[in-house]
């Protein structure tokens, strides 16, 4: 990524839900290429209604570069922490720093919050390495997922 000044991360609007759903599907389907058992994703990843509900609840975010939607996130904010439900980037923009930019934007949303939590599938080598690179520490795991936490 050459220039962060052309990037915008903000709450999604209703008109963006269809595009964000499309990008979510495309992004999560690439997980199949890095260890996923099938073309699949987290609950609701391929459901426009689910994304619409997340948007109405204020949890769906849009990531734009040069005013083009290239990714998004679903996050849940409380007074002390942020749970990162998922991030996704258009596969055409993978490995260009935009995932890092989204994570940095999330971590900068509210400077009073210093605790960030997320989980990712055990089998997804790419996302586990990505979150560790960003300073997230494994807190627990089960048969499906690894749970991570970061304190700023």
Language model: regions and residue ranges:
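A short helix-loop-beta-strand connector motif used in the catalytic cores of GNAT acetyltransferases and
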Residues: 48-62
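Conserved acetyl-CoA pyrophosphate-binding loop and the N-cap/start of the following alpha-helix
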Residues: 93, 97-105
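Conserved active-site alpha-helix within GNAT-family acetyltransferase domains
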Residues: 100-101, 122-141
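Conserved GNAT acetyl-CoA-binding A-motif
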Residues: 103, 110-122
């Amino acid at each position: 990524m050459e220039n962060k000044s052309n990037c915008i991360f903000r709450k999604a609007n209703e008109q963006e839900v269809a595009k964000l759903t499309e990008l979510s599907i495309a992004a999560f389907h690439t997980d199949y290429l890095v260890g996923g058992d099938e073309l699949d994703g987290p609950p609701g990843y391929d459901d426009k209604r689910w994304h619409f509900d997340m948007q109405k609840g204020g949890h769906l975010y849009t990531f734009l570069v040069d005013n083009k939607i290239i990714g998004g996130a679903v996050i849940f904010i409380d007074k002390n922490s942020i749970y990162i439900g998922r991030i996704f980037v258009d596969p055409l923009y993978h490995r260009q720093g935009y995932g890092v930019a989204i994570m940095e934007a999330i971590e900068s949303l509210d400077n009073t919050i210093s605790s960030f939590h997320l989980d990712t599938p055990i089998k997804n080598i790419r996302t586990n390495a990505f979150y560790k690179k960003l300073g997230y520490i494994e807190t627990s795991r089960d048969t499906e997922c690894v749970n991570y936490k970061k304190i700023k």
